[in-house]
Regions:
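Flexible, glycine-rich loop/tail regions that form catalytic "lids" or insertion modules at the edges
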Residues: 301-313, 317
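A conserved short coil-to-beta-strand element within the FAD-binding core of flavoproteins
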Residues: 141-146
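Conserved catalytic alpha/beta cores of large enzymes that bind or transform nucleotide phosphates
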Residues: 58-130, 194-198, 209, 213-215, ...
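Active-site nucleotide/adenylate-binding loops and adjacent lid/helix of ATP-dependent enzymes
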Residues: 13-18, 125, 130, 152-163, ...
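Short, small-residue-biased leader/transition segments that mark boundaries at the very start
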Residues: 2-4
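Conserved metal-phosphate-binding beta-hairpin within the catalytic cores
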Residues: 22-57, 320
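Short acidic loop-to-beta-strand element that houses the catalytic metal-binding Asp/Glu
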Residues: 37-41, 150-156
Length: 320
């Protein structure tokens, strides 16, 4: 709200991730984002950069935990010699974070992890984290918003009231009443229950505004303006394609640029200039010109690599 008050509101109000139903909602601890998954890269200059921020549905932590477990088995001496900070407590810390937003008076809140289902690419992580925290893994069809406005999970013993939902479903698919009306993975009435504090949702609906890559471009300025500090880790230079000068620079140096949709994640919709044919370049420029707010551009970065076993040999693979 401070950012909107002090600067042009259009950056927020025109974002694909802006949700009007979040306006005036008051949350416990006044905290909207409880989990942040920023993508870090190591560039050719040897420095680390933040490539993008993920606050809507951050994913990937289970792979970090599994990787650390394997590394400790294979190279235990490295962890002993260099005092590497342990990460084993992550599931416990995550559970404590979820429990802290409980709006009920229960000392042992009922917490569930809401997954899109077995066909989601991150389903392994959903089941892993639910198991590690000792909470139920549920799909939308397992939950119901009753007449009293509270959320319940269906069990063989009957309905059990849910206090906190760790959602791994995008905003638009959480509730057919407030997003995609055809969603089959959400829960009808869930957003209203959240607005009325009858259930807590982590991360809160509306956090996608912080995922917006056009908003990302302003994060260093936000840090300097509001915290009076310099960012510890720098952002990648980002060109806003609503700006005519930025557009001209990007189009004139297309081969050195990466074009990204502001609301996508996981590499979806990205165009790498050097890999484009003439027709692909022209098609990308047309898309940008039709909706400049929907795209940003960044210079192509040479990412660090790690040896990866491909089935026959070790090959370099880029890291982020």
């Amino acid at each position: 709200q401070m950012c909107i008050r002090d600067r042009d509101k259009s950056l927020i109000l025109d974002s694909p991730a802006y949700k009007k139903y979040c306006v005036d909602v008051k949350l416990k601890h006044n905290t909207w984002s409880h989990i942040c998954g920023s993508d870090l890269i190591k560039a050719h200059d040897g420095k680390f950069y933040v490539l993008e921020d993920n606050l809507r549905v951050p994913s990937g932590v289970s792979y970090m935990l599994e990787n650390r477990m394997i590394m400790k088995r294979v190279f235990p001496e490295l962890f002993y010699q260099y005092g590497v900070t342990p990460i084993d407590a992550y599931p416990t810390k995550l559970y404590e974070t979820l429990a802290s937003v409980n709006n009920s008076r229960s000392k042992k809140p009922e917490i569930v992890l809401l997954t899109p289902g077995v066909f989601n690419s991150a389903y392994y992580e959903h089941s892993f984290l639910a198991q590690q925290m000792g909470i139920d893994l549920v799909e939308g069809r397992d939950l119901i918003v009753a007449k009293d406005g509270f959320v319940y999970k269906k069990t063989i013993e009957g309905l059990v009231k849910v206090d906190v939902i760790y959602r791994r479903i995008d905003d638009d698919y959480l509730d057919p009443d407030q997003g995609n009306p055809k969603t089959t993975i959400g829960v009808k009435g869930l957003i209203r229950a959240w607005q009325e504090k009858k259930v807590a949702i982590v991360n809160s609906p509306g956090c996608g505004i912080a995922d917006d890559k056009a908003v990302y471009a302003y994060v260093p300025k936000m840090i300097r303006f509001y915290l009076k500090e310099e960012p510890i880790i720098r952002n990648i230079k980002t060109f806003l394609l609503t700006n005519k000068d930025h557009r001209n620079l990007v189009f004139n140096n297309f081969k050195e640029m990466v074009i990204k949709p502001v609301a996508e994640s996981g590499g979806y919709g990205i165009v790498i200039g050097k890999n484009c044919s003439r027709s692909e370049k022209d098609a990308t420029i047309r898309k940008v010109m039709n909706n400049p707010r929907n795209y940003v551009a960044q210079p192509l970065i040479s990412l660090s690599t790690t040896p990866t076993y491909s089935g026959e040999s070790l090959e370099p693979r880029h890291l982020d």
